[in-house]
């Protein structure tokens, strides 16, 4: 019993001690609260000052002029180009075939080789044709002798009839015999010429100048004049043509360009429209419009001496049809599109901006031709446009576009 009482007293004493320690702790820290409040006030005051400073900075920033870049419009001569998609086509394409039947004895070309008209390309076994020629020549010689004999007899008959040693009927018969022999001789001469022609055909030559394709038959095969694939295909690449299309609305423009006396200049560009491949001239225009596409076909011719164009190659075409003289040219970056159409921001002498509606026609690279609403030597904004308002004053910063750039070409936009 005494042990339990002692344990209870110890627990009570421990609780009292803990309570005293807690009380002393709070009584020692509570005087620091005013200092803390002062520090908090100081921080609050400092924060307020910063807020005030930031507000002033924003107001100062609002008073800063919006930076823009500008360029000056100019008057220039701008070539007017029509664009189209085209396919390179050979000026002439020939499937080389034999004109006679026989065994192919030799091929005198390499695949992909450039050949000239008249070059020997293949040979057919000539022996059968040489035999036919010899026979025809022999028959010709025989009938020539027959004719000579008939002519001599006719000369004698003409003398004898004068002395009445032969009848007139015999003279007429001999005259007919001579004429018959002459006819036979002409037939023989034709047979000789035909045999000679067949022999000549055994040597196959290039009918045009061009590039040899892949051979369609090997040496040793028996070929005929009716073979569909022939021996090889020759395509003429010097010069070469491009067939392309333009909208039917441009027909009058093209016809006017042709009336100038010089065929319009045509440029061929690669598939990506990044590299100029060759330059030629317009050759011809089709005589009807494609009702399905509303376009018309045109053909241009290129020298192609550097083999830049290849048959069936896809190219982009630009054809010069006119030159716009004294056209007002502005950077295309200055022209914007709004609800009311195209417009630009112009700068006055006080660097104040104002919006002006414009009409444009053709464009090339960084330049666009302005046909209405803008004159030459006017300063227009090219960058920083999204920050502009009517009548706002701006700060013009240097730009590469502030220097005049010569207009060199144009396309319809």
UniProtKB/Swiss-Prot annotation:
Signal peptide interval: 1-32
- What's any one GO cellular component for it? efflux pump complex
Read off the Gene3D superfamilies from this record: 2.40.30.170, 2.40.420.20, 2.40.50.100, Helix hairpin bin
What domain of life does the UniProt record list for this protein's source? Bacteria
Q: Name one GO molecular function term.
A: efflux transmembrane transporter activity
User: Compositional bias of type Polar residues: which residue ranges?
Assistant: 32-46
Region of interest (Disordered), residue spans: 32-59
* Cellular localisation: Cell inner membrane
Q: Give the record's keywords alphabetically.
A: Cell inner membrane, Cell membrane, Membrane, Signal, Transport
Membrane topology type: Peripheral membrane protein
Query: What InterPro entries does the record point to?
Result: CusB_D23, Multidrug-R_MdtA, RND_pump_MFP
SUPFAM superfamilies tied to this protein: HlyD-like secretion proteins (SSF111369)
Relate the assembly described in the record: Part of a tripartite efflux system composed of MdtA, MdtB and MdtC.
Give the UniProt family note.
Belongs to the membrane fusion protein (MFP) (TC 8.A.1) family.
| Name of the protein described by the UniProt record | Multidrug resistance protein MdtA
